[in-house]
Amino acid sequence: EVQKNLEYYIVNGFGSSMYRGLMLDSLKGRSVSRKSGSNQAAGREAMVIILQMIDSLSDEAKETMLSTMKYWMEQNPGFVDGLEGVENLAIKKRAREILEDSSIVAAVEPLHKSFQYMDRAVNRLDDYLFAVSMYSERTQNTEIMNDENRMGWHQNNGMTYIYDSDQDQYTDNFWNTVNPLRLPGTTVVPVNIGTGTPDSSGYAQGGDYCSNESWVGGSTIGNYGISGMSFSGAS
């Protein structure tokens, strides 16, 4: 059971939540506001974990992740060189073995994935990935905490992301410069919701809330899917 869960998290979790070695911002919560928490940095952390675990997977799962890792590393060539320090020697060696193994085909399969417990959807083809962030009575419009992501009010109001060959699009100060009231894909009244008054932590941590709506999610058939969100905004 533990083995099955491990493989599910790696293959269906990490394998569905990254693009060319980048962790999708739609899945990162308030960490999008951290300079140290870019999709490049988060993706590197995930790839290190996968390399540590890859030889513990079953043959089928291992074959899938070897192909995926080789593809990500080829598309993100700075990853291996960035593995510095004694603690990364074995990981760097394994990464180079994968890259130099001609029997491993670098590939990532197309997919459409609905993360029903997170109210997210991902559609991935060879040359792009499209993601949608939603929220419902189960999830919040954003995550505001510890003085982080203070203007994230509309991040899950149907915000859309398109990842393509520009790997710096969401890494190069995107969240510092984008208009938080006019996020891509959203149709909202551009209101500064604020963060309320400070609580016992000393931080004002309001501005995030669940929706009153339950009709949020999608259906998937193979690599095709459809998503929808009943949206009522703040109340």
Model-identified regions with their sequence ranges:
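Alpha-helix boundary/N-cap detector
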Residues: 37-41, 45, 60, 64, ...
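Aromatic-lined, polymer-binding surfaces characteristic
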Residues: 1-52
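Catalytic and substrate-binding regions of extracellular carbohydrate-active enzymes
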Residues: 64-235
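Structural helix-adjacent loops and short alpha-helical linkers that scaffold large soluble proteins
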Residues: 2-4, 54-67, 97
